Design a protein with these regions (language model features):
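Structural and coupling elements of P-loop NTPases
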Residues: 1-339
Length: 342
């Protein structure tokens, strides 16, 4: 491959972030997916997933059965730009009847966002999916969701993460209040307090105001004092971001918020860009590392039929592992030992 072409591939690789979202059913995974699209500008109004007739359906829930039941059955691949990066987001099924699709998807990503219901913590399906992530040494970012509702104590949730899945939590944002009193988060990296204002039905981006901790302390209140006490404890035990252990799948940066009201969504999406790794070389069938600028190769992780109800079709979703894809090129199918035009 020529040097200019190799350089372009390297540049594009650095701009890519490919990740999946895993969760137990109804933890808010598909709603979070929709809100990522909202904050990226890919959609102008978000439609949260609810199991009721007459409500808007999320963009990633496209099958009739998904829209009827308000759940994700098949993995959806979404691509959108954000902060001069190309984001590939794989919205995976959480319901156990459809989890085989999820396992295949986790072989195609570079990182994972694990969504936990803050009132329930780690649930059975999340635990199963996390074990697949661990077997692949995938970096995991954690989002404690639904803080706009009555929730468990955040310190207790951190203890549960470490005890149940042996993943050391390193909180990045920390809640001020919960339920109806949830007003914002403290960003431990910047030492600022972000105050959120709800929008109608959460259909548009939440209004955000950044304050210094000194400015925020003027608001006072029991919730604020409790937050300061907890932050002091986190600082004392050294619960800060550790990039090497995160990239090795040994620790997890933790963010808090509410996908439904958009609280904390932007900070989580920023973290995907800032913390999640870009694509790296992968082993081929001979277990040899294939350089990113080597001739084209790809891993097909999903084949979907009849996506368009107007005609019969069959589409393969593939993760490009090396080189450049050009429409109409001829490739070798290593499983069938044949060639095909793509």
């Amino acid at each position: 491959m020529s040097e200019p072409t190799a350089s372009r591939i390297e540049t594009e690789v650095r701009r890519r972030r490919t990740f999946a979202i895993i969760s137990h059913p109804d933890a808010g995974k598909t709603t979070l997916t929709e809100k990522f699209l909202l904050y990226s500008g890919a959609v102008q109004e978000a439609g949260a997933v609810h199991a009721r007739e007459g409500r808007r359906s999320a963009r990633s829930d496209w099958m009739d059965l998904e829209q009827q039941r308000g759940i994700s059955i098949s993995s959806t691949v979404l691509q959108f730009p954000y902060r001069h990066h190309t984001i590939n987001l794989l919205d995976t099924p959480g319901h156990r009847d459809f989890s085989e699709d999820t396992y295949r998807v986790l072989a195609a990503v570079d990182a994972v966002v694990m969504v936990l219901d803050a009132a329930k913590g780690i649930e059975s399906q999340t635990l199963k999916l996390f074990q697949v992530c661990r077997s692949r040494n995938l970096p995991v970012l954690t989002f404690l969701n639904k803080y706009d509702r009555p929730s468990r104590e955040p310190l207790g949730l951190l203890d549960e993460i470490e005890a149940q899945i042996d993943l050391r939590p390193t909180p990045i944002t920390w809640p001020v209040g919960s339920g109806d009193e949830f007003r914002g988060v403290v960003d431990r990296r910047t030492g600022t307090y972000t105050r959120f204002t709800r929008t109608a039905r959460g259909a548009s981006a939440a209004l955000e105001e950044d304050l210094s901790l000194i400015e925020a302390s003027a608001e006072g209140g029991r919730a604020w004092q409790s937050t300061l006490d907890e932050l002091g404890l986190l600082d004392a035990i050294g619960a800060g971001l550790d990039m090497p252990s995160f990239l090795a799948g040994q620790s997890t940066p933790v963010f808090v918020g509410s996908a439904l009201t958009n609280f904390g969504v932007r900070k989580l999406l920023d973290a995907v860009v800032d913390l999640a790794p870009a694509p790296s070389p992968r082993a081929d069938l001979a277990d040899a590392q294939r350089a990113l600028d080597a001739p084209f190769s790809a891993f097909v992780f999903k084949v979907q039929a009849n996506m368009d109800p107007s005609h019969r079709d069959r589409i393969a979703f593939a993760r490009i592992c090396s080189g450049r894809f050009d429409r109409g090129m001829t490739v070798t199918n290593s499983r069938k030992i044949g060639r095909a035009h793509v």
